Amino acid sequence: MNVEIGQSDSGKDYVLTGKDNKILSYQTPDLQYTTLGKFIIYRLLHDRDVKILITGKGKTTGTGKTTLAIVLAKWINEVRNEIFNLNEQWHAKDYSFMDVWEYLEKYREAKPGDPLITDELEYMADKRRHMTNENVKFSQAWSILRYKNAVTLGTAPGLSDLEKRVIETADIWINVVHVGKANTYYLTFDDFEWEPIYRRLRQGQFKESICWDELNDENYQWLKQEKENLGVPGLDDNGQENQLEQSDLNKREREVKNSTVKEMLKLLYENSLHDSITQSDIADVCGVSQQQVSNLKRELEKDNEIPT
């Protein structure tokens, strides 16, 4: 592997890596000068959400997906502070989630450019999990929530672990090839072939890769501890399915559905979208009856949480 170090037109160092005298990729230590960084900045400047999926090559664990998510989140926070003249501090405990409801609540209150991490995203949006409706409803909400000018960074073992709704509304796919290095792609979805389409991000004629250093700060330690505390949803310490009482499961499912409906109604009214999405649409997304949506809407009106 040959490595050439030089300077770009911007004066920033870059690294060109190649094999057999053929350049394969372009790496720059400063995200601001990557195509990925420019894409994120463009979206923030034009009041657009950004949804980024971070996976590991061959679903390999321990490659630094969480570390990369934190590195990106901290950089995005610095950029948005400059763009929107803010002075926000980024801490994992305030901006990282492994619970559907907590993520949706934070998204509803998001400030411009808020970088939100959904670590272990497959547990929130796994196409095979049916223990409760939370996983399915997260993917449906993910596909609708597009207008808060926030950035969501979701980590997962691989794209195949995620529901179609999550993949088809994501903007960027970052595939970690080994510790400290990842390839970046634009991500779209072919509805006819029912499969994702990805196109490598480039610096001119060169394929773009991003690199990062090992991280062991308080944000990483907090997320690591959260994952240890959480374990694998739906499994016990021995990897066996937890047996929940059906009554408890039904109660939890109702709570999740009602909470999701209310939050969606609030979001729609806050963003003046209540006339473009019907109660029937909400009922379909949340898996409830249209009458239930109407009842919950009246509750919100009674509590003055949405206008009558």
UniProtKB/Swiss-Prot annotation:
Domain of life the protein comes from: Viruses
Record InterPro entries: P-loop_NTPase, WH-like_DNA-bd_sf
Gene3D superfamilies hit by this protein: Winged helix-like DNA-binding domain superfamily/Winged helix DNA-binding domain
Region (Disordered): 231-252
UniProt protein name: Uncharacterized protein ORF16
